[in-house]
Amino acid sequence: MENYLLSSPTQLSQPYDDGTNSLLFMDNYELSQNLSQPLDQHLQSLQQQSQVQSQAPQQVQSLNQHQQLPQIQPFPTLVNNQQYAQETFQQLSQQHQQQQQQQQQFSPFQQSQLQQQFQYQYSQQQQQQHFQQPVTIEEEIVPASNNTNIQISKFFDDNKGDDEDIANSGNFNEFDHSRNISLDDTTITDLHRRENSINPPTGLPHSISSNTIYSYSSFESPQSHIQSQPSYSQGYHNQNSLSTPLRRNKSYSISSANFNQSPVNLATTAMNKIMKTPLRGHTRSRSKVDVNAAVTAAMNLGQATKSNSTSSYNSTLNPFYTPSQQLSSTDDDDISTPLLTPGTKLHTSKSTFFSPYNKDDLEDQDDDAVKQLRKAKSYTSLLRKKKREDMTPSKQNQQHQQQQQQQQQQQQSRQSGGGHIQNLSFPNSTSQPKIDLLAYDQNPMTSYPPMDKSILKNLNQSISPFNKPKLSPPPSNFPSISIDLTTIATNKSSSFSSSTTHRNYNENTPFNSANSTSGGLLPPMATFTVPTVIKEELQVHNLQEEEQEHQDEQMEIDSFESNEKNARPTLSTSSLVRSMKMANLEISNDQQMSSNEDENIVTEAVVKQEKNGPVVDDVNGTGTNSKKPRKKQKSKSKENCNKKGKVATGNGKDNDKNNECLVNKGNKTNNNDTSNDKLDNDNKNTNGNGNNDNDNDSEENNDNVDDADDDDDGTVTIPIPEDLNVTKVKVRNNRSKSNDKSDPKKKHKCPICESRFQRPEHVKRHLKSHSSEKPFECQMPNCGKRFNRKDNLKAHLKKIHGLVKGQEEFTRVLNENKEVS
């Protein structure tokens, strides 16, 4: 039962239109009885088939026969069917003449509708009789979709044109059977009522076969009977296609009878052109169906559905989906557009507008900023590489320089083995390449090997990246020795540079700030420990040279001593070395001086030191001398200077004035000497981290020397009190030094920081700032702050605690501080 013709899912999804004229005279039963003539010949064929079936099994008629109309497969041979056929044949023969007269009265549209209605009524009667009869096993109910009589030969016949196929398919497009029809209705009058269309059938199972979507072979062409064509052999080829307005057209269905055929060929030939009603204005013509996997799968399953633009199902799943079409491909191109298949949509779509997507002759623009930067960098890198190749020496020159360095090092090692080092100047200093500080990171010198990490253990100062301590790895028998590069950079004489380097070896101390900041071109470099054997040899050699220099200088010293009254004792070797170091400190490295000028400076320093008197020096350099006795000695010498100055002004003798000048000069050298002792002791006791302190001390010494020259204009230096514990050499002074020096009223000077004041009381008050003692304490609760001066305490009470002079708390704090002091 389930294989009988029912409405398809796509048909049910279509909107139902009650305003259609498809069932115009459905309720007029008498009128439908008069339209029985189209079944005359059909009933005759049924009688013949029933006789044949009684004798032998019925054979399936060929689908390629063009002489017969589409016929319904015969039902099983039943007695009731034969009797009913005879009765209906007699009734129809009597009414044959009446129908011919009525055909002239109705329009073609009404005739086609009535014929379709009568055909459906006849099929309903046949089905009702069939339900009452038992069905044997051998007898088979053939579904309507399998009984199709669509001429398949036309699909594969290449001789037939497209126009002929369209004309033949017009009869199928005109048919429209009613929807949702209940097959168990007993009366024809109740055929098309609304409740019967909505309610499901009562006697049949609700199953719909997908293979019975549309089948036109069960019904004959109504128009062929209207035109009264005598022969059916002409078939559909002689009939013209009529497009009825306001009717939905059907597409071809591929039923189960066509499964033995190739679905690909069927799709490409039969589906060339599908016509639609002219309800919609625009159209699309399909050239050929794109054969893909989706089409093949749909054809194999037999689920090719009707394509309609008003359907609600997804059109992308159906490869045969097209919008409403009516015009053919021969029409004007302005109103027809080729339908794009999914496979060729991207490849064949070409826009009429300009687009660089498929424009192959466009130039590639370098719009990317990164590409432009890379290109620019590549140009500059080529120039740098070429310049680098020009600047770097060749491998042969490098090997030649290395060989020369090794030979010189071997010669120096042999000389050091003999006990004397005659020349410790920088080896091959003139042949070394210059260091370009700007291009160092990009162009590292190949002649400079990488720094040895073991050197870092003995570093006392930071090493800059261009300050390489080793130019080449020395041989095993010659240890590394620190070299004073500042003396080499100043291009001084070989004798003077060698003497300075010898003293640096002897002292074995890191370069101080005075030595590094005196005009040198390179930053300070770290020194390294020297083995004891080489150190002893250097000491012996240095002592010999110092004795020779001492003999030469002693001759000049004797000439100065002959002019003086009091003979001075000879100086020790250590004092000579220290005096010469002071001379080196005072010489700027920017000045190109000869060896004679250096000797004159050394002799002047020695004369100044001899005039000051014998000095007890610490030869071992243990640094036991403290600051306090040194400054007491300094204050005593200044007191003597002041006393002698007063005597000189009272008596007015020239000899006393000369003595006063000598005393002042002696004080100058004494101050320099004590400051140098302090500087040496600080360098020996520190680990190289106190460079800033040394800088401050050296600047203070220079200031002291400059200020000492102003003693000639009548300034008085106040002596340091004996009970004062001096801990701060340099204190914060808000007064400007230039104003102090230029102001003639300020004739009293501090012996420690050389600050000038108008009165001696001011100097005594100022001296307390150099001491760490703070006798004045604030007695306010939760304060306890101490001050070294009373006026500072007063300012504190006034500013912090808000006490005004004359209040009880203010006076109490001051009185308590007086008692303590």
Swiss-Prot record:
Modified residues (Phosphoserine): S769
Name of the molecule in the record: Cell wall integrity transcriptional regulator CAS5
Basic residues biased stretches: 372-387
Record bears the keyword Transcription regulation: yes
Subcellular location: Nucleus; Cytoplasm
Signal sequence interval, chain numbering: none
GO cellular component: a single term: nucleus
Compositionally biased tracts (Polar residues): 222-245, 319-329, 422-432
Composition bias type Low complexity, residue spans: 305-318, 396-412, 662-674, 684-693
Principal localisation: nucleus
Annotated organism of origin: Candida albicans (strain SC5314 / ATCC MYA-2876)
Tree of life domain: Eukaryota
